[in-house]
């Protein structure tokens, strides 16, 4: 629609009963054909080409939305703190490799990672070329179970179609590490397993999360 927001970030996304709404258009501009906006934006959400051209385009917003989605799906609450712990964060931002340096949580499905990675590609021509193209890729994902961490080694979720409640958790004994899945407080034996190694148990748990986030 010719409007460039230039400040897409979690703080500017408002949640309501109808879904998510983008807010704070204080830096927004209307672009003409072939025009580019002035150098504005949230530094950590800017694409690498900005640091050489000092201009913003629709691809700048697409990159910023991709970074916002990356933060949301990985539950990164302390974004600034996460960046400060990285080696040479300014260099990573300017190279467009900040998200790659941080990495995804292991339970993020490959299909979602591919969509985000395309949106935040360091090469502008390899990104989605329009917001509608980006949206269409996301809409092809069919939500399965809406999982969220509830405690260390534990996730709870609601099935987006049936409303069933799920809980999966890792517990340990002196001899084993156990992953238990419950549906509406009933243990689902076919999805429970025991392991001698904690890493293998976590891998099993995270694989289940990743395989059920979308149908």
List each language-model region with its residue ranges.
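Conserved C-terminal C-lobe helix
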Residues: 107-122
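Conserved activation segment of eukaryotic-like protein kinases, specifically the C-terminal portion
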Residues: 36-50
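Catalytic-loop of the protein kinase fold
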Residues: 3-15
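Conserved catalytic-loop aspartate of Hanks-type protein kinases
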Residues: 61
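Conserved HRD-motif arginine in the catalytic loop of eukaryotic-like protein kinases
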Residues: 127
């Amino acid at each position: 629609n010719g409007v460039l927001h230039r400040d897409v970030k979690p703080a500017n996304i408002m949640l309501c009963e109808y879904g998510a709404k983008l807010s704070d258009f204080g830096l927004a501009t209307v672009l003409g054909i072939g025009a580019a906006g002035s150098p504005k934006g949230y530094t950590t959400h800017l694409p690498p080409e900005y640091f050489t051209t000092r201009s913003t385009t629709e691809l700048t917003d697409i990159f910023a939305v991709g970074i916002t989605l990356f933060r949301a799906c990985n539950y990164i609450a302390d974004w600034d703190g996460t960046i400060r712990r990285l080696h040479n964060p300014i260099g990573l931002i300017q190279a467009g490799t900040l998200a790659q340096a941080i990495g995804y949580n292991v339970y993020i499905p490959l299909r979602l990672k591919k969509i985000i990675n395309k949106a935040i590609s360091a090469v502008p021509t390899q990104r989605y070329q329009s917001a509608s193209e980006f949206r269409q890729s996301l809409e092809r994902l069919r939500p399965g179970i809406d999982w969220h961490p509830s405690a260390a080694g534990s996730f709870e979720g609601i099935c987006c179609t049936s409303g069933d409640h799920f809980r999966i958790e890792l517990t340990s004994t002196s001899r084993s590490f156990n992953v238990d899945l419950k549906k509406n407080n009933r243990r689902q034996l076919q999805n429970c397993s025991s392991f001698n190694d904690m890493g293998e148990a976590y891998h099993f748990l995270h694989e289940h999360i990743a395989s059920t986030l979308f149908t």
